[in-house]
Swiss-Prot record:
One of its GO terms (biological process) is symbiont-mediated evasion of host immune response. The lineage of its organism: Bacteria, Bacillati, Actinomycetota, Actinomycetes, Mycobacteriales. The chain crosses the membrane at residues 142-162, 166-186. Pfam families: DUF3043. Keywords: Cell membrane, Membrane, Transmembrane, Transmembrane helix. Residues 13-31, 90-108 have a biased composition (Basic and acidic residues). One of its GO terms (cellular component) is plasma membrane. It is a multi-pass membrane protein. This is Uncharacterized protein Rv2206.
């Protein structure tokens, strides 16, 4: 009796499950139609799945910008193309003349820069304020000008006579202290004179003082631009 009852219940379950299966099978064609339409729409808008959307620069890269010459097949073709792109070849005399012209042009520019012409100066040296600072520095004797000669002399003596190093070190320290004091005095003097001569100046005293100290630390003959005033001259 239990087996018969079990079979009946199993049969009822099959009967109950058959309409559900039929309903599922009946829904499959509709789902297939909707999924097919969705994928077709997606492929039209976003492209195939699994690939990133191309960026604007990548899409432009693939577009043709114009006719492209074919690549050379031999070394002779490559040489011919390089010659055609390089233009006409200059002779030896023409190259020498071009080098001489460039050298003369550079020499002229340097001479005008050393003479202090405003159009050929470096950006740090341009302007009437910087010119006035240079004149102030060039019109006085500066202890900072001894920096390079004293440093070179110290190095030479230390390598030639190492025993004198013990006596030269304190002397160099004293000289460095004096040069520092001279740089401070020069910076204050330059700032005061610039404020008097150029009341509308907007450049800070600190920058002008550094510019003056840097020029004063150079040897007079090597200063660029060249000094326009003599030592002890009146700069106004």
């Amino acid at each position: 009796m239990k087996l018969l009852g079990h079979r009946k219940s199993h049969g009822h379950q099959r009967a109950d499950a058959s309409p559900d299966a039929g309903s599922k099978d009946g829904c499959r064609p509709d789902s297939g139609r909707t999924s097919g339409s969705d994928t077709s729409r997606g492929s039209q808008t976003t492209g195939p799945k699994g690939r990133p959307t191309p960026k604007r620069n990548q899409s432009r890269r693939h577009t043709k910008k114009g006719p492209v010459a074919p690549a050379p097949m031999t070394a002779a073709q490559a040489r011919a193309r390089r010659k055609s792109l390089a233009g006409p070849k200059l002779s030896r005399e023409e190259r020498r003349a071009e080098k001489a012209a460039n050298r003369a042009r550079m020499t002229e520019r340097r001479e005008r820069m050393m003479a202090g012409e405003e159009a050929y100066l470096l950006p740090r040296d341009r302007g009437p304020v910087r010119r006035y600072v240079r004149d102030v520095v060039d019109s006085r004797r500066n202890l900072l000008g001894l920096f390079m000669p004293s440093a070179l002399t110290l190095l030479f003596v230390m390598f030639a006579v190492p025993q004198v190093q013990f006596y030269l070190s304190p002397a160099m320290l004293i000289l460095l202290a004096l040069m520092t004091i001279d740089a401070i005095i020069l910076g204050r003097k330059v700032g005061r004179l610039v404020d008097t001569k150029f009341p509308s100046n907007t450049e800070s005293r600190w920058r002008l003082g550094l510019y003056a100290a840097g020029r004063a630390s150079q040897i007079r003959r090597l200063r660029a631009p060249r000094p326009q005033v003599e030592r002890g001259g009146d700069v106004g």
